[in-house]
């Protein structure tokens, strides 16, 4: 199941605005940019996985794992624009490892509205 269109960031102008005005947090596997957006009452997600990470199958696997993590925590995420950039070490991780690493960096970025186990 996909995230609905309202939850996606697709336009380059939106990505550039978040890169410039947003706050970034990183760990070895991911960089997360967050930016407040008062126009909406839910989060929006943009995902960037470079071609340097591998072929399309691998890049799509990483993107699916990231989207799945956001779907699981959908009700606990604050209304912000969020961009997740996958780094090189993410290509060697399992889906569970991606989930744990992403949750770790999202907690640091303070995008959850309450404690997540």
UniProtKB/Swiss-Prot annotation:
GO terms for cellular component: ribonuclease P complex. It holds the Pfam family Ribonuclease_P. The keyword tRNA processing applies. It comes from the Bacteria. The keyword Translocase does not apply. Its EC number is 3.1.26.5. Transmembrane segments: none annotated. It catalyses: Endonucleolytic cleavage of RNA, removing 5'-extranucleotides from tRNA precursor. InterPro entries: Ribosomal_Su5_D2-typ_SF (IPR020568), Ribsml_uS5_D2-typ_fold_subgr (IPR014721), RNase_P (IPR000100), RNase_P_CS (IPR020539). GO terms for molecular function: 3'-tRNA processing endoribonuclease activity; ribonuclease P activity; tRNA binding. Belongs to the RnpA family. PANTHER family: RIBONUCLEASE P PROTEIN COMPONENT. RNaseP catalyzes the removal of the 5'-leader sequence from pre-tRNA to produce the mature 5'-terminus. It can also cleave other RNA substrates such as 4.5S RNA. The protein component plays an auxiliary but essential role in vivo by binding to the 5'-leader sequence and broadening the substrate specificity of the ribozyme. This is Ribonuclease P protein component. It comes from Staphylococcus aureus. The gene is rnpA.
């Amino acid at each position: 199941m996909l995230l609905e269109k309202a939850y996606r960031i697709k336009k380059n102008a939106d990505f550039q605005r978040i890169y410039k005005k947003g706050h970034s947090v990183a760990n070895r596997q991911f960089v997360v940019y967050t930016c407040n957006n008062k126009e909406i009452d839910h989060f929006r997600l943009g995902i960037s996985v470079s071609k340097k990470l591998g072929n399309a199958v691998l890049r799509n696997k990483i993107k699916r794992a990231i989207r799945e993590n956001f779907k699981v925590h959908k009700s606990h995420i604050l209304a912000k624009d969020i961009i997740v950039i996958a780094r090189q070490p993410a290509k060697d991780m399992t889906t569970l490892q991606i989930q744990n690493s992403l949750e770790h960096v999202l907690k640091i970025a303070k995008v959850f509205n309450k404690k997540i186990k």
